[in-house]
């Protein structure tokens, strides 16, 4: 029993150490990975590939799409399927800003969203989580309309 308790405590200590490991890559490399992942995510819309879109979502993702937040990968994919139903993409996006926590496990990407004619119609913000080495997935995503204000 004592050996089991020691093994359990040792395992917990080891896991706690892993959870707080510092970034194992440079911050610039991490930012580049997230930006590249965001561009690949956006390419899924241009390529009309809903399965590729789904591959970028964490299982417990939350998207602020529509009147209430969508919780979970399945709900997000079901809601977003309508954006992939037509031959032409209804919008496009690209990252302009990327920031990564010092811990290296969470990142923010944000940028413009354009309609098919290239007009800025919205801005997005996505929170990415590093779920495996070199594997970033979205945990939160939210868009916001832009003002079409005239001076």
Where are the regions a protein language model picked out?
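Bacterial N-terminal signal peptides
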Residues: 6-16
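A beta-strand edge to alpha-helix "cap/lid" segment located at domain peripheries
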Residues: 18-55, 62-151
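Positively charged n-region of N-terminal signal peptides that target proteins for export
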Residues: 1-4
């Amino acid at each position: 029993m004592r050996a089991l308790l020691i093994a359990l405590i040792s395992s917990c200590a080891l896991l706690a150490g892993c959870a707080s490991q510092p970034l194992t890559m440079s911050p610039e490399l991490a930012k580049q990975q997230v930006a590249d992942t965001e561009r690949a995510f956006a390419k899924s819309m241009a390529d009309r590939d809903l399965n590729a879109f789904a591959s970028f979502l964490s299982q417990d993702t939350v998207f602020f799409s529509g009147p209430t937040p969508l919780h979970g990968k399945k709900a997000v994919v079901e809601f977003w399927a309508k954006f992939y139903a037509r031959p032409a993409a209804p919008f496009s996006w690209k990252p302009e800003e990327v920031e990564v926590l010092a811990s290296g496990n969470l990142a923010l990407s944000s940028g413009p969203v354009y309609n098919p004619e290239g007009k800025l119609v919205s801005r997005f913000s996505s929170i990415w989580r590093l779920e495996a080495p070199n594997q970033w997935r979205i945990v939160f995503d939210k868009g916001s309309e832009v003002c079409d204000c005239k001076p």
